[in-house]
């Protein structure tokens, strides 16, 4: 989201994305990978923090240790343990070992060594996720609880420096960092963000020249789709409905879940409601972000699981009758929680209409909540149906499939399947770690289980409809971790 985007404006990690989304060096000038794939050695370039301190390997050690320290309860600590497989990360998070046992070592000021439990094919792509960014320990200790809350408590090592920001403000500014190691190739003098909640006001601000880039909603697309400054870019997010399989007995019935997913017309949702370039999705992993050993997109074929979830009123009716018989009920009523934002509310209304029309006797009641509350309710299991989304944190299908492992914090409905868990374990810590082709095939098998049991009802892959000034060039749009990067951007007078 935008918060990660801004953090990356003023902070560099070890690696960054090139224009095509591939991992290339940032603060790590070079790196070595051991023959067994379990040791990464990063050699840092000469770089400075905005207070003049050198960026050192110790800054990464401190930042990573903070991320796994159970006292900090970081929501992204799993990026080092489950995802990154950094030695001892899981044990530290569980409180079984001290943070000093984390498998990351400052060999010297310019050399960082990372030890992994198993080979992780996508490890380099994790390095541009903000959880893996460095933190200057001495500076942090002068800020403590206020760290990151104002320009005075933010330290930059990236292309830009935070110069104006207040937590409750509607605008914040960054200026070019003259000490950035690649400052000669940064064309922009700075970035000025405005928080504008009214999308029509934002569009008007763009049209008057007050903004160079803004997001659009579906209704606005019709107004501007012929404007050469209009673009639609993949955002990487999969929007889906999560049924609470554990807490709602009716939703524990697989046939009822199948009836519901077959009742959803995704083409109508994207074509008639969103109209922003978002595409129907019939997979649990959206397309255009994960490439396999053979160079192909993991989810390029959107027909492979169509028989498990594509709109089919006849199939929906058939599964519905079976479910009613099994449950001994002719009617059902479910509450669905949805974000208090424009697009999710419109999508939820159409989902409600489709389910109620195709499955007579089934009622969906919509409860609109602020996003933060909706997420909290789903994490707490305080929901029946939830309209939610997930974006890829790194360039591998596991960023989605890992969510459905028993006990994962994002497995909101508490679904559990031993075969699925076993496949994911083999792909994460087992023999398949060293068999890229076998691992890829196994991930397809895992995805099939999720869809065939209707663990989620995938809806669409999100695109962002945006206006970007014709005077601006070089903005990189990515579906993974950071949606927009401005290092190569320029603005003509």
Protein language model features and the residues they cover:
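Gly/Pro-rich hinge or "lid" segments in bacterial periplasmic/extracellular proteins
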Residues: 116-186, 190
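Long beta-strand-rich cores associated with HINT superfamily self-processing modules
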Residues: 466-493
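Surface-exposed binding/hinge segments that line
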Residues: 61, 72-138
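N-terminal lobe/hinge region of extracytoplasmic solute-binding protein
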Residues: 1-35, 155
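Ligand-site clamp/hinge motif
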Residues: 154, 178-224, 236
């Amino acid at each position: 989201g935008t918060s990660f985007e801004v953090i990356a404006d003023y902070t560099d990690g070890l690696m960054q994305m090139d224009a095509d989304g591939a991992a290339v060096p940032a603060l790590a000038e070079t790196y070595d990978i051991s023959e067994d794939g379990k040791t990464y050695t990063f050699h840092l370039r000469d770089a400075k923090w905005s207070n003049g301190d050198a960026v050192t390997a110790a800054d990464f050690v401190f930042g990573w240790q903070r991320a796994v320290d159970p006292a900090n309860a970081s929501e992204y600590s799993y990026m080092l343990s489950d995802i990154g497989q950094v030695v001892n990360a899981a044990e530290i998070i569980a409180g079984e070992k001290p943070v000093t046992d984390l498998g990351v070592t400052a060999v010297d000021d310019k050399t960082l060594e990372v030890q992994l439990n198993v080979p992780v094919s996508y490890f380099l792509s994790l390095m541009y996720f903000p959880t893996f960014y460095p933190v200057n320990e001495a500076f942090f200790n002068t800020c403590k609880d206020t760290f990151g809350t104002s320009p005075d408590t933010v330290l930059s090592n990236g292309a830009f420096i935070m110069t104006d920001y207040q937590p409750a403000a509607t605008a914040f500014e960054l200026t070019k960092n003259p000490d950035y190691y690649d400052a000669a190739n940064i064309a922009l003098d700075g970035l000025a963000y405005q928080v504008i909640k009214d999308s029509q006001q934002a569009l008007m601000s763009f049209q008057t020249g007050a903004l160079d880039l803004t997001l659009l909603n579906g209704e606005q697309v019709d107004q501007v789709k012929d404007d050469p400054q209009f673009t639609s870019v993949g955002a990487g997010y999969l929007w889906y409905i999560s049924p609470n399989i554990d807490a709602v007995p009716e939703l524990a019935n697989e046939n009822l879940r199948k009836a519901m997913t077959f009742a959803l017309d995704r083409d109508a949702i994207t074509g008639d409601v969103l109209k922003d370039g978002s595409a129907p999705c019939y997979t649990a992993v959206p397309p255009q972000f994960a490439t396999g050993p053979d160079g192909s997109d993991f989810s390029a074929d959107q027909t492979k699981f169509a028989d498990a979830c594509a709109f089919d009123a006849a199939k929906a009716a058939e599964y519905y009758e079976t479910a009613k018989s099994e449950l001994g009920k002719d009617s059902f009523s479910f509450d669905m929680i949805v974000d208090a934002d424009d697009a999710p509310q419109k999508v939820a209304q159409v989902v409600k209409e489709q389910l109620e029309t195709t499955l007579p006797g089934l009622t969906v009641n919509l409860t609109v909540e602020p996003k933060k509350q909706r997420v909290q309710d789903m994490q707490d299991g305080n929901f029946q149906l939830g309209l939610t989304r997930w974006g890829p944190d790194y360039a591998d299908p596991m960023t989605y499939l890992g969510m459905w492992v028993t006990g994962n914090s994002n497995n909101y409905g508490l679904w559990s399947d031993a075969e699925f868990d076993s496949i994911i374990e083999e792909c994460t810590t087992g023999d398949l770690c060293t068999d890229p082709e076998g691992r890829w095939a196994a991930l397809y098998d895992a995805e099939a289980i999720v869809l065939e049991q209707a663990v989620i009802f995938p809806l669409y892959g999100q695109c962002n409809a945006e206006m970007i000034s014709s005077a601006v060039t070089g903005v990189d749009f990515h579906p993974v971790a950071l949606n927009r990067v401005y290092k190569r951007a320029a603005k003509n007078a």
